[in-house]
A protein has these predicted regions:
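Class I S-adenosyl-L-methionine-dependent methyltransferase catalytic core
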Residues: 1-148
Length: 148
């Protein structure tokens, strides 16, 4: 993380000790976030973005399957009037294994970051960029033990 303060929460206690909160429930969040950064459930991702845009002062970033850019319903609901400032495509596949970390995992699924700028720097257009390969460069011996 490159922020001065990172606060995590979750909807259920998975043993990490995070404060519990249903992010999608109306009302005040547990804290005033500058950024909301999440990998939401695919079917609820638009809800997470809309809620994030309500509460964040800096921006919202969601990691979702790249096909999330498709769909007339999502376009009408979100992209038409609230397009992201950036769509950042991972050029290598990002394997995600439920409940654990497996450095040997592979996937056929492509992922992108969709990023909204709430702070006012955004000019209204959506920029597309590529995230270069980094998995091998960033991997460290011991990662599997730390995150398994």
């Amino acid at each position: 993380e490159y922020f001065g303060n990172v606060v995590c929460s979750d909807i259920a206690d998975y043993g990490a000790g995070y404060p519990l909160q249903d992010f999608l429930q109306p009302g005040e969040p547990l804290w005033q976030p500058q950024w909301v950064i999440t990998n939401p459930p695919f079917r609820l991702a638009a809800d997470f973005v809309e809620r994030g845009l309500e509460v964040a002062t800096g921006g919202v970033a969601v990691l979702v399957r790249s096909v999330w850019a498709e769909g007339s319903g999502r376009y009408e609901r979100l992209f038409k009037d609230k397009p992201p400032a950036w769509i950042l495509q991972h050029v290598e596949r990002v394997p995600m294994v439920k409940g654990r970390y497996d450095p040997a995992a592979s996937t056929a699924t492509a992922y992108s970051w969709f990023v909204w700028d709430v702070a006012g720097v955004w000019d209204g257009g959506t920029r597309f960029g590529w995230l270069p390969p980094s998995r091998l460069r960033l991997y460290r011996d011991g990662d599997a033990q730390c995150f398994a």
